[in-house]
């Protein structure tokens, strides 16, 4: 799989994970202010903006690139917050919901491509 295919597969798995945990998916791959939000979901009193990071790992869960969440740098966080603000300014119906920025890590086997583990970090970053 290419890195793009790995990323898209990770996003697909993240959507399934969120739905299984009673999140309502509002949008996927939403482009806002020249940035992309992987998943926008509604959950209880929250409007949740989710960044999905996927890594292929060996059987020991090791990746040469560190944890997926470590790829969400301060710069990336700022861009996601800008995109979330842009989305909320255009979608007033979610204005009463509390915004939350989550990260979902997806680990895939580098041998089989099958999912090994998903970590969900709620309220992972903010202003």
Which residue stretches match the model-derived regions?
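Conserved catalytic cores of phosphodiester-cleaving nucleases, focusing on short active-site segments
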Residues: 18, 39-61, 80
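A short acidic/basic microdomain associated with nuclease active sites
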Residues: 19-33
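Short, low-complexity, polybasic intrinsically disordered segments
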Residues: 105-127
